[in-house]
From Swiss-Prot:
Lineage of producing organism: Bacteria, Pseudomonadati, Pseudomonadota, Gammaproteobacteria, Enterobacterales
Domain Nudix hydrolase: 30-164
Pathway: Isoprenoid biosynthesis; dimethylallyl diphosphate biosynthesis; dimethylallyl diphosphate from isopentenyl diphosphate: step 1/1
The protein's required cofactors: Mg(2+); Mn(2+)
Name by which UniProt lists this protein: Isopentenyl-diphosphate Delta-isomerase
GO biological process: dimethylallyl diphosphate biosynthetic process; isoprenoid biosynthetic process
Gene Ontology CC terms: cytoplasm
Amino acid sequence: MTEEHVVLLDEQDKPSGTLEKYAAHTLNTPLHLAFSCWLFNEDGQLLVTRRSLSKKAWPGVWTNSVCGHPQQGETTEEAIIRRCRFELGVEITDLTPVYPHFSYRATDPNGIVENEVCPVFAARATSVLQVNSEEVMDYQWSEFKSVWKSLLATPWAFSPWMVMQASDEQARERLLNYCQR
């Protein structure tokens, strides 16, 4: 995969340039565009992934299925499809926004800051996973309600963006409705 960049955003969340992804994630990360996607299988189970230990931010932490950054000139939907293929080796369908205006700022234990405008989507996996071990060290298909209980009981074991996304009542309801259809 070619070197990824992030799309930098101004105070009005409008694109203002790009920066190499690795250089962007520092102790003073500029605001940039990202996405988060929650994948479900045909049985309505959620794919929860554990970030590789080689990740710069939140290594080894459990998180939602796939996250990433749209490249300049790429739609969020195109970026989600690209990252699902790269990280999980999976094809998806029924890509649906569930929390389109999510944004957050969080600092990991190493001091690396995430500072993202990060629309959240749900999608359905349509093929068998072929996980990229440089991105994902473990994964599990689980019932959404079980994952929610785990997030409430042990939020420190999960990425802050996953906890924040699921903590939004409207987003949680949309995810629950999505997995039940």
